A protein has these predicted regions:
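Short, structured segments at the rim of ligand-binding sites
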Residues: 1-2, 7-10
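Glycine-rich anion-binding loops and their surrounding alpha/beta cores
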Residues: 9-16, 21-221
Length: 221
């Protein structure tokens, strides 16, 4: 019911920027958010039909592979276990550099904290499939209700607490997925190291500071 765009809007960010402004925001903050309807010019024409259908369609699968930045490295979450290896195979055909495709056994299109997760990782032209659990990273299994957000406001409140250093399932969920992105970027060698770095960033206020600088910059251009 609530996604990344909803969260950023609730945080006070302006996400309706063209490419030139996005470049400036990225250069000054190291972060940007690309609101799909503004950057997939062809996709905007099918949005009304998708909303009327009310179910997942082929367009849910096309999005990650039509990244407007032509990203060579990507973390992709999929909503069905059967799609994980399909996505990594497509990434290989597209000759992408490093891609991590994830699916939680509880049905989440993310690495889950409430259950084990399946991952298909493409790197240097080779695909490796494996399972991970929260325990692999020194974390405990969480409760699904504790990470669920039924509104943008609830999502913002939960993330704000995690960014303020409150440990628990929400912070763990953020850390375990951030870890995959940190591994992709080459900042850490393992996801376990990524979890530790991500938690430190939240507990030391760095994540909150980054969010605030992005929100401020997005409104000043």
């Amino acid at each position: 019911k609530t996604g990344s765009a909803d969260f950023l809007l609730e945080a006070g960010a302006d996400i309706a920027h063209d490419r030139s402004l996005l470049k400036s925001i990225f250069e000054q903050t190291g972060f940007i958010f690309l609101f799909a309807p503004l950057h997939h010019s062809s996709m905007r024409y099918v949005m009304p039909a998708r909303q009327k259908i009310g179910k997942k369609t082929i367009f849910n699968l096309l999005g990650p592979h039509t990244n407007p930045c032509s990203a060579r490295k990507q973390l992709i979450g999929v909503y069905k276990r059967s799609l994980v290896e399909t996505f990594s195979s497509v990434a290989k055909e597209l000759e992408m550099e490093h891609v991590i495709v994830v699916h939680g056994n509880d049905g989440l299109d993310e690495i889950s904290i409430t259950d084990d997760s399946f991952i298909s990782e493409l790197k240097d032209g080779k695909i490796k499939n494996y399972h991970v659990s929260p325990k692999d990273f020194g974390l405990s299994y969480g409760n699904f209700e504790s990470i669920k957000a039924s509104s943008p406001q609830e999502s913002f409140e939960k993330v704000s607490l995690a960014f303020a250093g409150r440990e628990g399932s929400v912070q763990d969920m953020i850390a375990i997925n951030s870890a995959a992105a940190l591994k992709l970027s080459g900042i850490v060698k393992s996801m376990k190291d990524g979890v530790e770095l991500s938690k430190s960033a939240m507990n030391e206020g760095l994540a909150q500071s980054k969010l605030e600088s992005y929100v401020k910059m997005s409104n000043n251009l």
